[in-house]
Amino acid sequence: MDFDELYKKILHHYEQAKKSLDKIEKTMLEHSALSDVVPGYNADFLEFESYQEDNFTVLFVDMRKSTRRAKKIGGKKTFLSMHAYIPAMLEIISYHQGKVIDIMGDGIMAFWGGKKSGLIKKNAVRKAGMCGLDMIKAMEKVVNPILKKDGIEWEIDIGVGIAYGNVIVTKIGIEQFYDVKAF
């Protein structure tokens, strides 16, 4: 992983977020949720009240003590921090060919493998493991230096968990509102 290149990309995301601070208004913004993203599965071909089983390597990353940190540093610095941290993690997942399943607050879930991927267990686990290591390195070499340079002294600390195993893929919700999820 080229951390110098990652630094440039994340600095760009961060600078864009800084520029938008003055423009943010207290209005509801339209968002599109990550949906229908479990690799190899499509909501159109899944039925409610049914499921399929598959094997994936799952990576979950989240910030440690993020609520305490946010209370201490305030809204603007938390906003800027998230616009350095989340894009960095997503860039690294993309680099290691993972599939982002969900972004939940300051946590991100990504998958490797699955029956339809052609990726064997050993390689899926290796890719996820290398991704996790690069995430930890990126905090030290990219994200925290960008924040510190801008006067945000409280460094972001992350935890990364990786597991391989059987998951249940299902279409869950009601006709108007549903998602494809893996448990």
Descriptions of predicted regions:
Residues 64, 104, 165:
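Anionic group-transfer/hydrolysis microenvironments
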Residues 55-58, 107, 155-159:
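Broad gene-expression machinery/nucleic-acid interaction feature
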Residues 70, 78, 100-102, 120, ...:
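Short, surface-exposed helix-loop/turn micro-motifs enriched in polar/charged residues
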Residues 67-70, 112, 171:
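Activation segment
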Residues 86-119:
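Conserved helix-loop-beta segment at the catalytic/binding core of cyclic-nucleotide signaling proteins
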Residues 1-87, 91-96:
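Juxtacatalytic helix/coil linker segments
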Residues 57-59, 99, 135, 168:
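Protein kinase-like catalytic core scaffold
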Residues 115-183:
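Catalytic beta-strand-to-alpha-helix segment of the class III nucleotidyl cyclase homology domain
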